[in-house]
Every structure is written in C-alpha cells, then in structure tokens.
Amino acid sequence: MEDEQINFANKNYKISEKDVREYVLARFQDVKCSKKIKNLVTFQAANKYMIMAHDQVELKNLGNIVASYKKIPFSDILQEYQGHLKIAMVKEPTMKTHTNVIMHIFGYFSKHLSQGEKQLFFEWLEQFRENRIATGNVLSKISPIIYRFNNTYLASQTYFLLYSDVQPRILFNVLNKKNTLGEINLE
C-alpha cells in the first residue's frame, strides 16, 4: 500500500501514504520545537484518528505517554513519544483499520441521525468495504454531517485533512510546505 495514491475531488492532486506520514511527522517536529506540553496534547488529540488508522495499539501507548507528563521530564516524554509515533506511522492503514476509524467517527453523531441517514451511512461504508469508493469519498460524505452537528473535535482531525476529498487545495498548500522543510528526520 506504500505507493497507493489517494484520489481527491480534483483528479490532478494525489497524495500517498508517504505524504501522510511526512505531514504527521513534520507536525510533531513543530511540537518538539515548541517544547510545550499543551502542544503535544493538542497534537495527540488532532491526530487521534490518523494514528488509529495506522496502529491502534500505538495510539494507546501514545496516549499513556502524554498522560505521564507530570511524572516524567518533558524531554523524555518527547523522545518516547517520537519513537512510538514512528512505529505507528510506519504501519500501513488497511481497509479494516479505516473502517474502524470511520465507525468511531460515526459514533459521535449516530444518535442524532434519522433511520434513513443511518442506512445511507452504512450503504457508504459497504461501498467502501467493497472497494467501490475510496476513503476520501466516504469522508467527504461524512464531513457535512460533522459541520451540521458543529463537532469541532472531529472537524479538526488530520484524518479528514489528509484523506477527505473535501478541500484538496488546502491540503496541497500544507503539503507544499514540506518541500521547504526538506527531508524530515526525527532521529
């Protein structure tokens, strides 16, 4: 899946899993430079579903590392977090892990949907599982629901930024910044 390209609404723009990893790791580098626990907490929250798509076990480990900030020096937390983040991001997301993430997201608003809307959601999910639509297509269908219920937590998830078909122009402005950063080396 390394070379798999995720298609966006504009077919001229494509993003690879390598681009996803580089983006997340570059944002972590920003956290390291800030040397602030609040930025690490924000990073962890914003990347929860992205990391979950890659490695749910490491997501839990990362959460525990962040939670230990009162017991361990921040520099040690950053070093341990970085190691586990790299492990998580190396693992390729699968249909199963994306489905798990999408179901977790669905849980945020499912009780507010009508039966017809729920049925439509599960039809999208089935199309995704049958490989008839891409991850981005499912997320771009979910995105308006998130805004309808004003769920800022979900709207701020990098999972939507990097996989959704909704706003590829913004994504590529962000990813173009990686070219100015050069190779990202977190060792």
Feature map (PLM): residue ranges:
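Acidic, Ser/Pro/Thr-rich low-complexity regulatory regions
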Residues: E2-E187
